[in-house]
A protein has these predicted regions:
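Beta-rich, blade/repeat-based domains predominating
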Residues: 48, 74-85, 128-137, 149, ...
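Short glycine/acidic-enriched loop and turn motifs that connect beta-strands
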Residues: 44-47, 95-99, 148-152, 211-213, ...
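Short loop/turn segments immediately following beta-strands, especially the blade-tip
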Residues: 56-62, 109-115, 159-169, 218-227, ...
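Blade-loop segments of beta-propeller domains
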Residues: 66-137
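A short beta-strand motif characteristic of beta-propeller blades
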Residues: 66-72, 118-123, 179-185, 231-237, ...
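Bacterial N-terminal signal peptides
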Residues: 16-26
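Asp-box/WD-like beta-propeller blade repeats and closely related beta-sheet repeat scaffolds
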Residues: 116-194
Length: 397
């Protein structure tokens, strides 16, 4: 045992000073990680938004700093795709016949930890209103959903190769579904709304709102010009007039969940090697209500215990489901989005907060979330933002 005497007090002081400095440095390192960055896509044609906002989010307090770290000028960058492995950001420029610039495009930026993003390049999507995109697991292609509001030619799926530096190259493959549905206004032709790679990356599942089908394609990058080919079976048929919008896989890869926009329903499936087997078809409309519902975004929690669906229209709620052990759903909560048209939302990696993009009320909303129960709690912040349409989270610096 060491005995402390007056003679070694200088040593003690030096030791205490060193410990204090170390503690301050450690505190500073922790404080630096308290902030994460969020990226906000938007519609610029009917708002004052400049394009994409990069904002700082304090994931200790749940507060967004209203002063942007950076703004990226871009036309209608409604959907964002992050490739954090390669440090890139892609956006669909959802232009179409109703806009001043009618040409749908995809834009790409190189991400910089300082917030100084550099535009890599752009290319056209060969279709109207590219509303969604996803990245192949190997990072070689973007799969672009051209919604195509005009019945002729309607929607399409575009396959866009990416150069080694991330530059979007000309589209090499176009896939159009010659189909329509029963809805007199929304289903006169195919309207591709999203395309999602399977958990193993070997297939692409394409939700076509106009066709009432989810089309399944095999992905083979060895066929560089035409990497997608119809699977067998080539599609999964859904109830007439249901309007499939977005599909999400459970983290275990064994289940999938689909938002049906036109019928205001959520479907749950078992998934095996490209085959979706439907387990449930759940109504979001409350019995006897004439309120207009319109499900939009759909995401699971990172732990796979809960599913969240944004319900727009006149309802404007987030609907929370518990995911049972067999993958089926049980509704547990309906929580106001505190705004109009909750087009997208994101849950922070620690599960403590949900960030909502309320498109038509021009605002971002932060809700507290209970990671244990999955329920959404108090409203922590409401922040003005022009026509927000998507939210993506960047890892803390």
């Amino acid at each position: 045992m060491t005995t402390l005497t007056r003679g070694n007090r200088p040593t003690l002081l030096r030791l205490a000073s060193a410990l204090l400095v170390g503690a301050l440095l450690a505190f500073g390192a922790r404080a630096a990680t308290d902030d994460m960055h969020i990226l906000i896509g938007s519609y610029t044609h009917d708002s004052d938004s400049p394009g994409i906002l990069r904002l700082r989010f304090d994931h200790k307090t749940g507060q967004i700093d209203p002063k942007p770290v950076q703004t990226l000028a871009s036309d209608n960058p409604s959907w964002l795709v992050l490739d954090e492995e390669r440090g890139r950001l892609y956006a669909t420029n959802e232009n179409g016949p109703a806009h001043e610039d009618p040409v749908g495009r995809v834009s790409a930026w190189q991400l910089d930890s300082t917030g100084d993003h550099q535009l890599i390049g752009q290319n056209i999507s060969l279709g109207d209103e590219p509303t969604h995109a996803s990245l192949s697991h190997d990072g070689r292609y973007l799969f672009i959903s051209n919604y195509g509001s005009r019945p002729n030619p309607g929607g399409s799926l575009a396959v866009m190769p990416l150069a080694e530096d991330g530059h979007p190259l000309p589209v090499t493959q176009m896939l159009a579904h010659q189909s329509s549905g029963v809805h007199p206004e929304r289903q006169q032709s195919a309207h591709v709304h999203s395309a999602v790679p399977s958990p193993d990356g070997k297939r692409l599942l394409v939700s076509d709102l106009g066709a009432d089908r989810v089309f399944v394609y095999r992905y083979d990058p060895r066929q560089a010009e035409r990497p997608l080919q119809p699977d067998e079976p080539a599609s999964i048929e859904l109830p007439a007039g249901s309007g499939p919008r977005h599909l999400v896989f459970h983290p275990n890869g064994k289940h999938a969940y689909l938002a049906l926009e036109l019928s205001a329903q959520v479907a749950s499936f078992d998934y095996t090697n490209g085959t979706l087997t439907r387990r449930q078809l759940l109504d979001l409309k409350e019995a006897g209500s004439d309120v207009r519902h319109s499900p939009g975004a759909i995401h699971t929690s990172a732990d796979g215990r809960f599913l969240y669906v944004s319900d727009r229209g006149d309802y404007n709620h987030i609907i929370v489901f518990a995911i049972e052990a067999d993958g089926t759903l049980r509704e547990i909560q309906r929580r106001s989005s505190e705004g109009r048209e909750p087009r997208e939302f994101a849950i922070t990696p620690d599960g403590r907060f949900m960030l909502i993009a309320n498109q038509l009320s021009d605002e971002l909303v932060v809700l507290r979330r209970d990671a244990g129960s999955g329920e959404l709690g108090e409203t922590l912040q409401t922040l003005p933002a022009g026509r927000p349409s998507d939210i993506k989270l960047l890892a803390p610096n």
